[in-house]
Design a protein with these regions (language model features):
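Generic structural signal for well-ordered, non-membrane alpha-helical segments
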Residues: 4, 20-24, 60, 64, ...
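Acidic/His-rich, divalent-metal-binding segments that scaffold phosphate/diphosphate chemistry
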Residues: 1-59
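Divalent metal-dependent catalytic cores for phosphoryl transfer on phosphate-bearing substrates
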Residues: 38-141
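Divalent-cation-assisted or electrostatically stabilized phosphate/pyrophosphate-binding catalytic cores
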Residues: 128-168
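Alpha-helix initiation and N-capping motif
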Residues: 4-8, 44, 78, 131, ...
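Long, highly charged low-complexity segments enriched in Glu/Asp and Lys/Arg with interspersed Ser/Thr
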Residues: 167-176
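A generic alpha-helix surface/boundary motif
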Residues: 5, 9, 25-29, 64-66, ...
Length: 176
């Protein structure tokens, strides 16, 4: 199986954009925290988060199929991680998130992007961020307009958590 270090190198090989790298690292950090919280394999969950958008920059029309069919199998990425990455984009792959790692990857993807956008407009970034301010931004459809509110809601449902609890957990993760 691929190591965290190998996964980092693979991500850096395919992703040049600092913002997309940051997004992937945030999703990896979120997945790592949830894996530890749920007593799951933190390395697999972290790597799934880190590599979930591996092909987005170079092959946007083929995302995530280019990665899951061509790139990740050759990099010795496990079938579990490949399945999670496949299921994080069900509208593109037809594969719905079913296993725990798949559901959590879906749940962390869009909300991490949204929380990063919220942090960018706050002087203290994540420090002192509250659910109420995030919720207010969520209701403002013009703020981070490219982030799917439906996917954020569905993600919280998939992991059986109120959105406020999911967001609160992630804020805590990103302030560590």
């Amino acid at each position: 199986m691929v190591s965290r270090q190998d996964a980092q190198q693979l991500m850096e090989k395919f992703i040049e954009s600092p913002s997309l790298r940051r997004h992937c690292q945030m999703v990896a950090q979120a997945m790592d925290a949830y894996a530890n919280n749920l007593n799951q394999d933190a390395d697999s969950w972290y790597i799934a988060g880190l590599l979930h958008d591996l092909d987005w920059e170079q092959f946007p029309d083929e995302h995530p199929n280019k990665a899951v069919n061509d790139i990740l199998p050759q990099a010795d990425v496990s079938a579990e991680i490949i399945a999670a990455i496949t299921a994080h984009a069900p509208d593109r792959t037809g594969q719905q998130p079913d296993t725990q790692i798949e559901r959590y990857l879906f749940a962390c993807d869009e909300i991490c992007g949204f929380l990063d956008a919220v942090a960018k407009v706050r002087p203290a970034k994540f420090t002192g961020m509250k659910w109420s301010s995030v919720n207010k931004k969520l209701k403002n459809k013009s703020f981070a307009a490219n982030v799917s509110r439906d996917d954020i809601e569905q993600g919280a449902q998939l992991i059986d958590k109120p959105l406020s609890e999911h967001v609160g957990f992630l804020i805590e993760v990103f302030t560590r």
